[in-house]
Amino acid sequence: MTSILLVTSSPRGADSLSTRFATEIAEGLKARFGGALLTRDLAANPPPHITQAYIHGRVTPPEARTPEQVEAVALAQEFVDEVKAADVIVLGSGMINFGPSSQLKAWFDHITWPGVTFGYGEAGRPQGTLTGKKVYLVTAAGGVFSEGDWAPFDFQTGNLRHLLGFVGLTDVEIIRVEGTVFGPEAAKAAIAATEAQVRSILETAA
């Protein structure tokens, strides 16, 4: 039995390719292996930006937290518990102004929690605690950012890989859908390439 967490974040709704392919992967894995699938749609239910109550509350002993801190920390704990319970995480991210959406950034701000999802080991080096999980990261962009002149402007893929790794999620497979704004034929080819990659993932996943 496999527990799957699907996190989508694109505000494009039904037009979102990152949401489409992330959902296909999550549902395909569930169909193959069984288990539970939990979906967290950050666009439909955006997490709040972090506040002073959260920043102070997360390092305050539970019994000493103010009501505002209790409320702020409770949401972060809910997000963290969902990640901890998952064996597989499928994350969909559509590029917004060269980076991930603010909704997804807010989610990472909540789960990046000192003493809970990361700590510090020898020589003060950070060590993530959310280890032993597989992550499928689906990124979408209208242009081509994996190579060429626009590659230096991709502040989405590397950023998300770093944030995942910081909390211990280092087994990350990236699925890109890009180059969809260069006309119908280019979009068709880009989508077909991603469809083939998704099929391969579902056929070979262990």
UniProtKB/Swiss-Prot annotation:
Q: Is Flavoprotein there in the keyword field?
A: yes
| EC number annotated for this UniProt entry | 1.6.5.-, 1.7.1.17
The free-text cofactor remark is:
Binds 1 FMN per subunit.
Q: Name one GO molecular function term.
A: oxidoreductase activity, acting on NAD(P)H, quinone or similar compound as acceptor
**SUPFAM superfamilies the record matches:** Flavoproteins (SSF52218)
Q: Which cofactor does it need?
A: FMN
| Root EC class | oxidoreductase
* Residues at which FMN binds: S10, S16, L17, S18
rRNA-binding listed as a keyword: no
Catalytic reactions of this protein: 2 a quinone + NADH + H(+) = 2 a 1,4-benzosemiquinone + NAD(+); N,N-dimethyl-1,4-phenylenediamine + anthranilate + 2 NAD(+) = 2-(4-dimethylaminophenyl)diazenylbenzoate + 2 NADH + 2 H(+)
A UniProt-annotated Pfam family: Flavodoxin_2
* UniProt keyword terms in alphabetical order: Flavoprotein, FMN, NAD, Oxidoreductase
Function, as annotated, reads: Quinone reductase that provides resistance to thiol-specific stress caused by electrophilic quinones. Also exhibits azoreductase activity. Catalyzes the reductive cleavage of the azo bond in aromatic azo compounds to the corresponding amines.
Q: Subunit structure of this entry?
A: Homodimer.
Family listed = Belongs to the azoreductase type 1 family.
Protein name in the entry:
FMN-dependent NADH:quinone oxidoreductase
Q: Which species is this UniProt entry from?
A: Azorhizobium caulinodans (strain ATCC 43989 / DSM 5975 / JCM 20966 / LMG 6465 / NBRC 14845 / NCIMB 13405 / ORS 571)
